[in-house]
Amino acid sequence: VTTVDSSGYAPEWLRLREPADTAARAADLVALLPAGPAVVRDLGCGTGAMGRWLSGRLPKPQRWILHDQDPRLLEIAARSLPPGISVETEQADATRLNLTGTSLVTASALLDLLAKEEIQRLVKSCVDAQSPALFTLSVTGSARITPADAADEALNNAFNDHQRRAGKLGPEAAAFTAAEFTRHGWTVHTRPSPWQLGPEHRELIDTWYRGFVAAAREQQPDLAVPEDRQITEVTVHHQDLLALP
């Protein structure tokens, strides 16, 4: 399994990480959302994992509008949401949407892939439409691997620098997004949402670590990384963010 393929994130990677994502998300933030019928826009929806996690936690009726750049993922996501929910798909730039009439904007593992200007556009769209926003699982730049190795700090730093390529905010994205909403006078709630991976996540740990090392080495080709590493546990730190008008 690879995390990406020629056209974007591989569906197999998204399926592999879904149980860890489900366990990590801060479900208590959902209780802070306004009550009532839901029109939800899921940005960068992937295979629809956010919809599968969130739809059962929101009141009915629900209308979901799924956005992704990858038509393969949109097709998978549209088929996978629970019955009784209205589902539409749109292949579009998630940072250039008219959100009028949207009762909730949501995304998972998206903010750290965006540049400063893209986040500012997204925040302004939410503010203009007065649409609450729930953004989950943004990486914050820290991963703890057990057993530890002397190379881990350099590995983590190189990975974070790779995340910042092309002007992306990477590990700073969640904090920047929170500050932007606050600047507009909104209330922001944040929660830690770490992956806690153990022996039962063997395949996910191996796949994540291969991608982690590959990105770090792309950033710093001379990076020394231990071979045949026997990892037993990994904690990957994320942050969930809820912004309310």
Where are the language model's segments positioned?
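Conserved catalytic/acceptor-binding region of the Class I
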Residues: 131-192
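Class I SAM-dependent methyltransferase SAM/SAH-binding core
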Residues: 48-96
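Conserved class I S-adenosyl-L-methionine
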Residues: 37-46
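Short catalytic micro-motifs in class I SAM-dependent methyltransferases
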Residues: 109-110
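A conserved beta-strand element that flanks and buttresses the S-adenosyl-L-methionine
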Residues: 106
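Conserved Class I S-adenosyl-L-methionine
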Residues: 182-245
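A short, conserved alpha-helix within the catalytic core of class I
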Residues: 113-126
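Class I SAM-dependent methyltransferase Rossmann-like catalytic core
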Residues: 2-34
